[in-house]
């Protein structure tokens, strides 16, 4: 199976951005200087205003992307962003230390800044992540975007393949770390109907 570089720019499913449920999120990302809206403007093949028969409060713009071009454009953007270093590895474990290892004043400031988490009733400080290969990346905070990859499996008819979408590797170890940190896990099932080749 492949471990595709820069998976964060991939659009493996329905390649649209915006719409009724996610349009506000795209606008918030745009307001914060993010690239999603900018890149869809460069690569869309169709855009449509949804809910036009209703009031303006529920109007919502949705753009259909050329998913290959969107991926290439986003990858270019990421690779040319100053002060951004891209490392790729499968994370197996979130590393934390007890909050009481810092003095009380520091711990209080860090909790306010969102760098502290409560794990099994005890305040913990996130210090990094450990990869499957044993590498450690130290950090002050983690943004966790697992998508559909945690212990992923694809069902094709009666056949079960333990893999992520489109043959990409699943993240098979991170789930245990999240559970050990007191995070409750649920499995969601999505379905894609068979495509008819014209």
Go through each PLM region and give its residues.
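Short, small-residue-biased leader/transition segments that mark boundaries at the very start
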Residues: 2-7
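Conserved N-terminal glycine-rich FAD pyrophosphate-binding loop of Rossmann-like flavoproteins
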Residues: 8-30, 157
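Glycine-/proline-rich flexible loop or hinge segments
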Residues: 9-14, 51-61, 157-160
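Short acidic, glycine/serine/threonine-rich loops at helix termini
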Residues: 10-14, 96-98, 125-128, 153-157, ...
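Generic structural signal for well-ordered, non-membrane alpha-helical segments
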Residues: 18, 22-25, 63-71, 167, ...
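Conserved FAD-binding subdomain of flavin-dependent enzymes
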Residues: 22-38, 180, 184
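Feature captures the FAD/FMN-dependent oxidoreductase FAD-binding
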Residues: 38-151
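Glycine-rich loop(s) and the adjacent beta-strand/alpha-helix scaffold that form part
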Residues: 144-196
